[in-house]
Amino acid sequence: MEIIMIFVSGILTAISVYLVLSKSLIRIVMGTTLLTHAANLFLITMGGLKHGTVPIYEANVKSYVDPIPQALILTAIVIAFATTAFFLVLAFRTYKELGTDNVESMKGVPEDD
C-alpha cells in the first residue's frame, strides 16, 4: 500500500510541476496547491500506514501510529488553504488590473531609449 501511495505522490508532483510551468496564473495556482497535496500525501505515507493503531491509550495495544506526521499534515493543510486563497485573490486582482492571466503578456513595458 505504501508503494502505491509513493507512486501516486510522484505522479501528483509531476502533474503539479507541469501546471506550475504553464503560462496561465490559474494553472500556476492549481499547480502549487497540487504540489502541497503531493507533499502531504508523501509525508503521511512515510509516517506509516499499516503499523499500529490510533494513538489513544487502550489496554491491549502493543504499538501505536506516530502522531507527529499527522499533526504536521493538519498544520500544512491549513497553511496551504491560506496561501491558496491568497494566490487566488492575487491572480484575480492581476486579471482585473491587466485584463489577462497569461504570464507572458505581463512582462512589463519596454524602456524608452
Swiss-Prot record:
Highest rank taxon of the organism: Bacteria
Gene3D superfamilies in UniProt: 1.10.287.3510
Membrane topology: Multi-pass membrane protein
Regulation: Na(+) extrusion is completely inhibited by the H(+) conductor carbonyl cyanide m-chlorophenylhydrazone (CCCP).
Record-level Gene Ontology MF annotations: antiporter activity; monoatomic cation transmembrane transporter activity
Segments traversing the membrane: 1-21, 28-48, 72-92
Cellular component terms (Gene Ontology): plasma membrane
Pfam families: Oxidored_q2
Localization (cell): Cell membrane
Biological processes, Gene Ontology terms: proton transmembrane transport; sodium ion transport
UniProt keywords, alphabetically: Antiport, Cell membrane, Hydrogen ion transport, Ion transport, Membrane, Sodium, Sodium transport, Transmembrane, Transmembrane helix, Transport
Subunit: May form a heterooligomeric complex that consists of seven subunits: mnhA1, mnhB1, mnhC1, mnhD1, mnhE1, mnhF1 and mnhG1.
Family: Belongs to the CPA3 antiporters (TC 2.A.63) subunit C family.
Function, as annotated: Mnh complex is a Na(+)Li(+)/H(+) antiporter involved in Na(+) and/or Li(+) excretion. Na(+)/H(+) antiport consumes a transmembrane electrical potential, and is thus inferred to be electrogenic. Does not transport K(+), Ca(2+) or Mg(2+).
Protein name, as recorded: Na(+)/H(+) antiporter subunit C1
Phylogenetic placement of the source organism: Bacteria, Bacillati, Bacillota, Bacilli, Bacillales
